[in-house]
Amino acid sequence: MRPPALTPRLLLRAYALGIFPMAESRDDPEIHWIDPRHRGIFPLDEFHISRSLARRIRRMDWRVGVNEDFAATVEACADREETWINPTIFRLYVELHALGHAHSLEVREGETLVGGVYGVTLGRAFFGESMFSRRTDASKVALAFLIDRLRAGGFTLFDTQFLTPHLASLGAIEIRRSDYHQRLTEALAGNASFTPEGYWADPASVVQRNSQTS
């Protein structure tokens, strides 16, 4: 029997079950479904902005935007020697973006895209998919602005899928699968907005709000 066609709706159903897709490589057409025993998450009130990163944010001449060029952000995340983003995954996330369930946050130097992150939203959960950096600290800046936005929008779960040393240094932790599924169930029971009404994120405010919550 042929497996069901992979569609954005099927992808959202998988996220609701705590499963996410990956390919072995850019050229591998097969999609693998992942449900790790241990899951990386960012507690939204424990993101760590170091003094040096705070100075970088306050003094930066970069511009931060959201959903300005989702496809370019995903392409930039895939622009590395090894990537799990194959053409099928790229297409699916672009379609999810068109449906309002996938979002990007971009960091620009002038008109040049120098950093960013993208992910999927469902209920009060944000599933971080990938990020990239073409300037020192650009991905850290993207995360700082992203977490500030998630807090303001009412999100309660930021799923990073896996825990890396880079994410751990910024406050991410690893939890057991059972704990993750409980948090996911709670997050799916509510609603949040990636573009909350009246939200404004200038650099000084992002640093100040983080210091009040972390």
From Swiss-Prot:
GO terms for cellular component: cytoplasm. Its EC number is 2.3.2.6. One of its GO terms (biological process) is protein catabolic process. It is an enzyme of class 2 (transferase). One of its GO terms (molecular function) is leucyl-tRNA--protein transferase activity. Its main location: cytoplasm. Gene3D superfamilies: Leucyl/phenylalanyl-tRNA-protein transferase, C-terminal domain. Pfam families: Leu_Phe_trans. It catalyses: N-terminal L-lysyl-[protein] + L-leucyl-tRNA(Leu) = N-terminal L-leucyl-L-lysyl-[protein] + tRNA(Leu) + H(+); N-terminal L-arginyl-[protein] + L-leucyl-tRNA(Leu) = N-terminal L-leucyl-L-arginyl-[protein] + tRNA(Leu) + H(+); L-phenylalanyl-tRNA(Phe) + an N-terminal L-alpha-aminoacyl-[protein] = an N-terminal L-phenylalanyl-L-alpha-aminoacyl-[protein] + tRNA(Phe). It is found in: Cytoplasm. Belongs to the L/F-transferase family. HAMAP family: Leu_Phe_trans. Functions in the N-end rule pathway of protein degradation where it conjugates Leu, Phe and, less efficiently, Met from aminoacyl-tRNAs to the N-termini of proteins containing an N-terminal arginine or lysine. NCBIfam families: aat. This is Leucyl/phenylalanyl-tRNA--protein transferase. The lineage of its organism: Bacteria, Pseudomonadati, Pseudomonadota, Alphaproteobacteria, Rhodobacterales.
